[in-house]
Amino acid sequence: MNKPINLLVGGLTLFAAQGCKAPKQASQQAEHPNIIYVFPDQYRNQAMGFWRQDGFRDKVNFEGDPVHTPNLDAFARESMVLSSAQSNCPLSSPHRGMLLTGMYPNKSGVPLNCNSTRPISSLREDAECIGDVFSKAGYDCAYFGKLHADFPTPNDPEHPGQYVEEKRPAWDAYTPKERRHGFNYWYSYGTFDEHKNPHYWDTDGKRHDPKEWSPLHESGKVISYLKNDGNVRDTKKPFFIMVGMNPPHSPYRSLNDCEEQDFNLYKDQPL
């Protein structure tokens, strides 16, 4: 990859340093940078270790949680950190609807969490979403991980007319191609809170059950996409990637919900 990458994690932004470029090339890259947007679910601002470190603790009016986040800490030291960025609707589906459309929840089609036991709440098919905008601007667009912006319907691609589970699911949903809003590469699901037993539907609607800790699996798929394994993207185009990781979303009941090495960091921590 010879284009700069802008990597965003929630309120953190990193602009990767690049070597010297010819003025024309630098101008073209500035107009069409590669972008990766990573948004873990329910990640509270205070739960980042760097807020307890020199250079950060005096920038906020709260005490950071006693957490171990070495990668985010290193990332923050190389980044622009936004200390007061806020969401006016920090609830899963409504926030995702706003993020994708730029609309308030009452306009995006997603005023409620997408759940089959509630009134229909689903991303508007006629909305121009961020993926549509980047696609029209000449980007190769990829979405990985949790979407949770579509209402569960009986549209299992491998079993037409049936739901993606044996019974009507409360949460999980498959997103068909016509509802992907500009994302030409797809490896996603609706919502499913078994972090060591995730599943995904790919671009062609094939289901994958990797039996792997979901953030680890998703990061591996993103890396594979970046390397263009299998020629899955047009290398002549800049890329726009969104990665919706489910953890640290609940549950937190047992080692089935987390990696043992992470559990061991906190097992003796008083509540």
Residue ranges and their predicted role:
Residues 3-4, 11-13, 20-271:
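Formylglycine-dependent sulfatase
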